[in-house]
Amino acid sequence: MIMENKRIEKYKEFFTGEFLMGPNSLRLLDEMLEKHPLKEGGRVMDLGCGTGLTSLFLAKEAGVSVFATDLWVPAAENAERFKKWGIEDQVIPIHADANTLPFAEGYFDAIVSIDAYHYFGAKEGVFTDKILPVLKPGGVFIAAMPGVKDELAGEAAALLLEWMEGNKDDLDTFHCRRW
């Protein structure tokens, strides 16, 4: 059975291609929040939020104010979605690149990035120079990204490289724990 967590079960209507842009982002986020609960009422950036499903979950389940930040999904689209979901007073849609975040230094209590960090965070200096400065001292950074059980080789690596249009830098972000 896919759904066994009651907290996630409430959101099963969103488990469609329209909202999910990768693995089950709510399952990943829920597991992370179990280990690292956020302070209710805190200010959180959902970096790489996509269609805002993780922002919805953060607002409803963690009780935080969310800055739903994404480069690929227009903020206006997310604003409409957030209004429809009744969270427009708790979640602010932001259209921004992780390399040029429009926030003051030390602005966030936490930064969450579920299934997105590997798109922008693998480049040297992005985390320390672009992302970390907007996190308050003592703040929490939570990230979950795809991984593989074994190193990619042979046909699997060739297919993934083809899918990534030959960009070896992107392929280099997929490694197993033993790497």
Predicted regions and their residues:
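A short glycine-rich, Lys/Arg-flanked "PGG" loop and its adjoining helix->strand segment in the class I
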Residues: 125-140
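Conserved class I S-adenosyl-L-methionine
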Residues: 140-166
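Acceptor-substrate binding/catalytic loop of class I
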Residues: 160-178
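A short SAM/SAH-binding and catalytic strip from SAM-dependent methyltransferases
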Residues: 110-123
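N-terminal, positively charged/glycine-rich alpha-helical extensions of SAM-dependent methyltransferases
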Residues: 1-13
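Class I SAM-dependent methyltransferase SAM/SAH-binding core
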Residues: 45-47, 51-100
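Conserved SAM-binding loop and adjacent beta-strand
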Residues: 14-30
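A short acidic, Gly/Pro-enriched loop at the edge of an enzyme's catalytic core
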Residues: 99-111
